[in-house]
Amino acid sequence: MTNREMKSRVMTLGNRLTARGQNRSAAFVRAWVIVKQGGLELAVKGVTFGNRQEALRRLATYDPSQVRAVLVPEPSNPADTEAVAVMVGVQNGRGLFCLGYVPRNMAAVVKAMGGKLPALRVVSGAWGRPNYGARVALAV
């Protein structure tokens, strides 16, 4: 990425974050960090709720190229009107399943980054923990 392209992406993301109500200075610092890193990787929250652990266990058996993730804003969510759900599905599957949510403090950033499809990574329990987790990566 050239210096000019990088500046353009920082300006675009920074202005989108500012439009979503973030402090202008903080928005541009956050945009610069995200663009320099080449994107953003976030842990999906709420993966231990309901039958989501069973869904993650099953997703872990698929090749990553067969799994697709979609980020869906949920303005009618009673707990958080800014919530962004992480919906997943498999190739030739029966629709999408809500795997969890983007962390509350990053929802505005994810919305500002636009409708890019994220990459999903299922991670198994670490340090002896039996639970599965998931991470989504968004490229700039």
List each model region and its residues.
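Short intrinsically disordered terminal tails
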Residues: 1-3, 139-140
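IQ-motif-like calmodulin-binding regions
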Residues: 4, 8
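Conserved active-site motif detector
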Residues: 9-20, 25, 29-140
